[in-house]
């Protein structure tokens, strides 16, 4: 089985940051990425379980995978739909 998270083009460590900082950092990072590139986000703020999927829907990015059973949480975002 392939670990999708290991194949990310970029990684964003948001450990220790609290809302709204993780989403602000994701937005800033994604802005400098090319369409189709992937970003691994690692966070421990429980609010990211709601905020990251919401950000992806609102900004029309694809949430490829997420692991949110226990912290640290991992999200794999692909820029663009």
UniProtKB/Swiss-Prot annotation:
Its main location: cytoplasm. It is found in: Cytoplasm. The active site is at residue 19. The keyword S-adenosyl-L-methionine does not apply. GO terms for cellular component: cytoplasm. GO terms for biological process: tRNA wobble position uridine thiolation. Pfam families: TusA. One of its GO terms (molecular function) is sulfur carrier activity. Pathway: tRNA modification. Keywords: Cytoplasm, tRNA processing. Sulfur carrier protein involved in sulfur trafficking in the cell. Part of a sulfur-relay system required for 2-thiolation during synthesis of 2-thiouridine of the modified wobble base 5-methylaminomethyl-2-thiouridine (mnm(5)s(2)U) in tRNA. Interacts with IscS and stimulates its cysteine desulfurase activity. Accepts an activated sulfur from IscS, which is then transferred to TusD, and thus determines the direction of sulfur flow from IscS to 2-thiouridine formation. Also appears to be involved in sulfur transfer for the biosynthesis of molybdopterin. Interacts with IscS. Belongs to the sulfur carrier protein TusA family. This is Sulfur carrier protein TusA. The lineage of its organism: Bacteria, Pseudomonadati, Pseudomonadota, Gammaproteobacteria, Enterobacterales.
């Amino acid at each position: 089985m392939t670990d999708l998270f290991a194949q990310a083009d970029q990684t964003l460590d948001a450990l220790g940051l609290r809302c709204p900082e993780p989403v602000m950092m994701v937005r800033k990072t994604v802005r400098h990425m090319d369409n189709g590139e992937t970003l691994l986000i690692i966070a421990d703020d429980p609010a990211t379980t709601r905020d990251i999927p919401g950000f992806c829907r609102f900004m029309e990015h694809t949430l490829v995978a997420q692991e949110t059973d226990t912290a640290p949480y991992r999200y794999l975002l692909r820029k663009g739909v």
